[in-house]
Amino acid sequence: IIFHNVGSLGNLAVETSRMENVEELRQYYDLNVFNVIALNTQFLKIFEEVEERVVIVNITSLCAIKPMSGMAYYCSGKAARELYFKVLAEEKKHVRVLNYSPGPVETAMIDYVISEAVNENLKDVFHSFKSQGT
Protein backbone atom coordinates (compact mmCIF):
# COMPACT_ATOMS: atom_id res chain seq x y z
CA ILE A 1 0.00 0.00 0.00
CA ILE A 2 1.15 3.51 -0.76
CA PHE A 3 -0.44 6.78 0.31
CA HIS A 4 0.12 9.88 -1.81
CA ASN A 5 -0.49 12.74 0.59
CA VAL A 6 1.94 15.39 -0.60
CA GLY A 7 0.26 18.69 -1.21
CA SER A 8 1.08 22.34 -1.25
CA LEU A 9 -1.17 25.26 -2.04
CA GLY A 10 0.94 27.11 -4.53
CA ASN A 11 0.89 30.86 -4.95
CA LEU A 12 -2.33 32.24 -3.45
CA ALA A 13 -1.41 35.81 -4.35
CA VAL A 14 -1.66 35.46 -8.11
CA GLU A 15 -4.89 35.38 -10.09
CA THR A 16 -5.36 32.61 -12.61
CA SER A 17 -5.09 35.05 -15.51
CA ARG A 18 -1.69 36.20 -14.18
CA MET A 19 0.02 32.82 -13.73
CA GLU A 20 3.01 33.66 -15.91
CA ASN A 21 5.97 32.56 -13.78
CA VAL A 22 6.83 29.31 -15.54
CA GLU A 23 9.53 28.38 -13.02
CA GLU A 24 7.08 28.77 -10.13
CA LEU A 25 4.54 26.64 -12.01
CA ARG A 26 7.18 24.02 -12.76
CA GLN A 27 8.20 23.81 -9.10
CA TYR A 28 4.59 23.45 -8.03
CA TYR A 29 3.81 20.70 -10.53
CA ASP A 30 7.13 18.95 -9.85
CA LEU A 31 6.21 18.54 -6.17
CA ASN A 32 2.48 17.95 -6.44
CA VAL A 33 2.10 16.03 -9.70
CA PHE A 34 5.29 14.87 -11.43
CA ASN A 35 7.05 13.54 -8.32
CA VAL A 36 3.89 11.68 -7.29
CA ILE A 37 3.72 10.02 -10.71
CA ALA A 38 7.43 9.16 -10.62
CA LEU A 39 7.21 7.68 -7.11
CA ASN A 40 4.10 5.72 -8.01
CA THR A 41 5.80 4.32 -11.11
CA GLN A 42 8.71 3.05 -9.02
CA PHE A 43 6.29 1.59 -6.46
CA LEU A 44 4.48 -0.34 -9.19
CA LYS A 45 7.73 -1.62 -10.70
CA ILE A 46 8.61 -3.18 -7.35
CA PHE A 47 5.23 -4.39 -6.10
CA GLU A 48 3.02 -4.97 -9.12
CA GLU A 49 3.75 -8.71 -9.15
CA VAL A 50 1.80 -8.97 -5.88
CA GLU A 51 -1.28 -8.37 -8.06
CA GLU A 52 -4.47 -8.19 -5.95
CA ARG A 53 -2.68 -6.92 -2.87
CA VAL A 54 -1.47 -3.64 -4.37
CA VAL A 55 -3.37 -0.62 -3.04
CA ILE A 56 -2.75 3.00 -4.00
CA VAL A 57 -4.42 5.82 -2.07
CA ASN A 58 -4.31 9.34 -3.43
CA ILE A 59 -5.39 12.01 -0.97
CA THR A 60 -7.37 14.43 -3.08
CA SER A 61 -9.79 17.28 -2.55
CA LEU A 62 -13.12 18.61 -3.68
CA CYS A 63 -10.93 21.21 -5.38
CA ALA A 64 -9.96 18.51 -7.91
CA ILE A 65 -13.46 18.62 -9.39
CA LYS A 66 -14.87 21.96 -8.21
CA PRO A 67 -13.02 25.17 -9.01
CA MET A 68 -12.28 27.47 -6.09
CA SER A 69 -11.46 31.06 -6.98
CA GLY A 70 -7.99 32.01 -5.78
CA MET A 71 -6.64 28.45 -5.75
CA ALA A 72 -5.68 27.77 -9.37
CA TYR A 73 -2.43 26.03 -8.48
CA TYR A 74 -4.03 23.75 -5.90
CA CYS A 75 -7.17 22.93 -7.90
CA SER A 76 -5.31 22.18 -11.11
CA GLY A 77 -2.67 20.09 -9.34
CA LYS A 78 -5.27 18.03 -7.47
CA ALA A 79 -7.28 17.58 -10.69
CA ALA A 80 -4.22 16.39 -12.60
CA ARG A 81 -3.37 13.86 -9.90
CA GLU A 82 -6.91 12.59 -9.57
CA LEU A 83 -7.25 12.01 -13.30
CA TYR A 84 -3.83 10.32 -13.47
CA PHE A 85 -4.97 7.83 -10.83
CA LYS A 86 -8.30 7.29 -12.60
CA VAL A 87 -6.46 6.42 -15.81
CA LEU A 88 -4.13 4.13 -13.86
CA ALA A 89 -7.15 2.33 -12.39
CA GLU A 90 -8.54 1.84 -15.90
CA GLU A 91 -5.26 0.40 -17.16
CA LYS A 92 -4.37 -1.73 -14.13
CA LYS A 93 -7.61 -3.44 -13.16
CA HIS A 94 -5.83 -5.63 -10.60
CA VAL A 95 -4.48 -2.62 -8.66
CA ARG A 96 -6.83 -1.04 -6.15
CA VAL A 97 -6.75 2.71 -6.60
CA LEU A 98 -8.61 5.05 -4.28
CA ASN A 99 -8.91 8.81 -4.72
CA TYR A 100 -9.91 9.80 -1.20
CA SER A 101 -11.15 13.28 -0.31
CA PRO A 102 -11.34 13.66 3.47
CA GLY A 103 -12.95 17.10 3.31
CA PRO A 104 -11.61 20.10 5.21
CA VAL A 105 -9.18 19.09 7.93
CA GLU A 106 -7.88 21.57 10.48
CA THR A 107 -4.22 21.90 9.60
CA ALA A 108 -1.75 24.73 9.11
CA MET A 109 -3.09 24.96 5.56
CA ILE A 110 -6.26 26.65 6.79
CA ASP A 111 -4.31 29.32 8.67
CA TYR A 112 -2.01 29.78 5.69
CA VAL A 113 -4.92 30.43 3.32
CA ILE A 114 -6.47 32.88 5.79
CA SER A 115 -3.23 34.83 6.12
CA GLU A 116 -1.87 34.63 2.55
CA ALA A 117 -4.81 34.54 0.13
CA VAL A 118 -5.61 37.76 -1.68
CA ASN A 119 -9.08 36.54 -2.63
CA GLU A 120 -11.43 37.68 0.15
CA ASN A 121 -14.10 35.09 -0.68
CA LEU A 122 -11.49 32.36 -0.32
CA LYS A 123 -10.46 33.75 3.07
CA ASP A 124 -14.12 33.75 4.16
CA VAL A 125 -14.54 30.10 3.15
CA PHE A 126 -11.47 29.10 5.14
CA HIS A 127 -12.54 31.21 8.14
CA SER A 128 -15.77 29.21 8.03
CA PHE A 129 -13.83 25.93 7.97
CA LYS A 130 -11.81 27.08 10.97
CA SER A 131 -14.84 28.22 12.98
CA GLN A 132 -16.52 24.85 12.36
CA GLY A 133 -13.48 23.10 13.77
CA THR A 134 -12.85 21.05 10.65
Model-predicted segments: where are they?
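Conserved NAD(P)H cofactor-binding loop of Rossmann-fold oxidoreductase domains
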Residues: N5-A13
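Short, small/polar-rich loop/turn modules that mediate ligand/substrate recognition or access, typified
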Residues: R96
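Conserved hydrophobic beta-strands of the Rossmann-like cofactor-binding core
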Residues: I1-F3
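Hydrophobic positions on the long internal alpha-helix
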Residues: V36-F43, F47, Y84-F85
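C-terminal helical subdomain
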Residues: N99-P102, T107, S115-T134
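Substrate-binding pocket helix/loop in short-chain dehydrogenase/reductase
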Residues: A13-R26
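Catalytic loop of short-chain dehydrogenase/reductase
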Residues: S8-L9, V22-E24, E48, R53-A80, ...
